[in-house]
A protein has these predicted regions:
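Short secondary-structure junctions
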Residues: 29-38
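Active-site rim elements
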Residues: 12-15, 101-102
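Nuclease catalytic cores
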Residues: 17, 21, 25
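Catalytic cores of nucleic-acid endonucleases
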Residues: 79-135
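Conserved catalytic cores of phosphodiester-cleaving nucleases, focusing on short active-site segments
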Residues: 28, 59-63, 73-81, 115
Length: 135
C-alpha cells in the first residue's frame, strides 16, 4: 500500500456520505494499481442553474491509477445512485417529488459538466459510478 494514500485509520479521516462511498474507499485501499486516492479533496466551481450563482463542487474522489500499460492516469470520481444520474420520469411532473428530483438532476448535471471541463483541462478523466459499478 502506498504511503501517499494516507492509510491507517483512513476511514476516520476521510469523508464519506454513504456506504457506497465507503465501499469505494475499501476498493481503493486494496487495489495495488491505485497509487493515490483522496475523498472530497478537489474543488470545482460551477454555475448552478437553479439560482444562477457560482458554487463549489467537491467530487467524491480523486484517484491516481497505474494502468496495465504502465501509464499513470488521474480520475475524478462521483458516486451516485443510478436514479440520480438521469432526468426524472415525465409522467410524474405534477408532484413535489418530481420537482425536487428535476432540480437535483439539473444541479448535478451542472456539477458534472464543470467536472468534465475541469478534467479535460488537466488531462484527467471524470467518472460517475453507480450501484451497478460497486456491487
Amino acid at each position: 500500500k502506498a504511503e501517499s494514500r494516507g492509510l491507517g485509520d483512513v476511514y476516520k479521516r476521510q469523508i464519506y456520505r454513504s456506504l457506497w462511498e465507503r465501499k469505494f474507499m475499501v476498493f481503493c485501499d486494496n487495489n495495488p494499481s491505485i497509487l493515490e486516492w483522496g475523498s472530497e479533496e478537489v474543488i470545482i466551481p460551477y454555475r448552478c442553474p437553479t439560482d444562477g450563482r457560482v458554487h463549489r463542487y467537491y467530487p467524491d474522489f480523486y484517484i491516481k491509477v497505474r494502468e496495465k500499460s504502465g501509464k499513470l492516469t488521474k480520475y475524478i470520481i462521483e458516486v451516485k445512485p443510478k436514479k440520480q444520474t438521469s432526468p426524472p420520469h415525465a409522467k410524474d411532473k405534477r408532484t413535489a417529488a418530481y420537482r425536487r428530483a428535476a432540480l437535483t438532476f439539473a444541479k448535478n448535471r451542472a456539477k458534472w459538466n464543470a467536472a468534465q471541463d475541469f478534467c479535460e483541462d488537466r488531462q484527467m478523466n471524470f467518472l460517475i459510478l453507480t450501484e451497478d459499478h460497486l456491487f
